Amino acid sequence: MSRYELTVQVRTRYLPEQSEPSQDQYAFAYTITIRNTGEVPSQLVSRHWVITDAESHVQEVAGLGVVGHQPLLPPGESFEYTSWATIKTPVGTMRGEYFCVAEDGHRFEAPIPEFALAMPRMLH
């Protein structure tokens, strides 16, 4: 176990009611679970996302916290939230990182592994 470590799990779903395929707008919800698997209480301060569609168009999003929160996670605790993104193709990817500060002042990044955004039945 690393002294400073947050692990990230992701679930996604297509949002047909928010999408307009005829206008190249595909919306996806993603639910993130962030768990402090380290040894020190740590706070998520900011985030950076790289969102890529099937035509290699890239959007970058950065900002403070997540959904209005900067959660402080003691070891073993987790925080879950749901947000959404839109892309211009029925398939794409997201990846990124959370920027964190441990209780002792140490700064570190928690990687968000790349995950797929895909309409149902678009990926085999």
Curated annotation (Swiss-Prot):
Gene3D superfamilies, A to Z: ApaG domain (2.60.40.1470)
Domain ApaG: residue ranges: 1-124
One Pfam family here: DUF525
InterPro entries: ApaG-like, ApaG_domain, ApaG_sf, Uncharacterised_ApaG
Disulphides: none
PANTHER family: OS05G0170800 PROTEIN
NCBIfam families in the cross-refs: PRK05461.1 (NF003967)
Name of this protein: Protein ApaG
Origin species: Ralstonia nicotianae (strain ATCC BAA-1114 / GMI1000) (Ralstonia solanacearum)
Name of the gene encoding the protein in the UniProt record: apaG
